[in-house]
Amino acid sequence: MKQVVYTASPNSCQIHVWSLNNEGELSLIQTVDVPGEVQPMVVSPDRKHLYVGIRPQFSIVTYQIGSRGELAQQGISSIPGSPTHISTDKQGRFLFSASYSYNNLSVSLIDDQGIVGEPVQVIAGLQAPHSANIDWDNKQLLVPCLKEDRVRIFEMAKEGYLTEKRAEEITTAMGAGPRHMAFHPNQQVIYCINELDSTVDVYRKWEKYRTVQTVDSLPADLAGVRWSADIHITPDGRHLYTSERTSSLISHFVISQDGSNLTLAGHYKTEIQPRGFAIDHSGKYLIASGQKSDHISVSSIDKYTGKLTELTRYPVGKGPMWVTVLAL
């Protein structure tokens, strides 16, 4: 399997494009100067385009992906707020942008050439939406709103129009601050990292989502303000990882067979202030970015235990905060 790693460094307005080999080694393919501070990134479902959100001129930039993973800019379109997280539907027809600072969620059409256009819907009045996550069936969009302590749920029509389902929303503990989500491959369980108390909520789907577990991701005796960031699951659904920026820790959970129960298995020091990380498509490697270290690091994931072993660190641009992996 050929894989490419994209790292976004907003403080230097750069994307670094890396080749990832089977031994977990990275080789730099390209350094792209982006027309703004690049933050969230997402690969299109057909793996032909990379979409990135930039500021201060709030926009989505469309890049065509070449045969080696290299990028060529194809288009740029405006959005109504600073992009905190972007995603697409499963068919690659719509792009969703959540704006934490501007308290809105937008829907943009993606044309037949894979280029993102202007927004066709803007939903205002959300309090600090931090991500937009399409479900397995491509029917519902789940939006954790950090300052509301709830996950709003929107039904998606065929033309991409979103309608909120207030009766189905998920509430968290007061002051938890829901942020990012990971989806189990069994299509029944979702995990949400809460930024402010560093817990992980486990939601299982029946007629509606129900919280079946809340577990702390950090050592009980850890001092300091909690500031969790990212969450990802291995492709086989056996291991879950979260990052926390004050302690610069990656936390590891073992997942039960049905996905409903997490067991904390360990903590690992990583890059300073790990805002974003990713797991490769083989489930063998975890790539973490350090906003304060200006480096990324690659760690191997033990196939059976899920234990992390750091392999190598690589310098990138300034303030790296997002990692995306593409399987060519």
Swiss-Prot record:
Pfam families: Lactonase. GO terms for cellular component: cytosol. It comes from the Bacteria. GO terms for biological process: glucose metabolic process; pentose-phosphate shunt, oxidative branch. Its EC number is 3.1.1.31. InterPro entries: 6-phosphogluconolactonase_YbhE, Cycloisomerase_2, Lactonase_7-beta_prop, N2O_reductase_N, WD40/YVTN_repeat-like_dom_sf. Gene3D superfamilies: YVTN repeat-like/Quinoprotein amine dehydrogenase (2.130.10.10). Keywords: Carbohydrate metabolism, Glucose metabolism, Hydrolase. SUPFAM superfamilies: Nitrous oxide reductase, N-terminal domain (SSF50974). It catalyses: 6-phospho-D-glucono-1,5-lactone + H2O = 6-phospho-D-gluconate + H(+). GO terms for molecular function: 6-phosphogluconolactonase activity. Pathway: Carbohydrate degradation; pentose phosphate pathway; D-ribulose 5-phosphate from D-glucose 6-phosphate (oxidative stage): step 2/3. Disulfide bonds: none annotated. Belongs to the cycloisomerase 2 family. Catalyzes the hydrolysis of 6-phosphogluconolactone to 6-phosphogluconate. NCBIfam families: PRK11028.1. This is 6-phosphogluconolactonase. It comes from Photorhabdus laumondii subsp. laumondii (strain DSM 15139 / CIP 105565 / TT01). The lineage of its organism: Bacteria, Pseudomonadati, Pseudomonadota, Gammaproteobacteria, Enterobacterales.
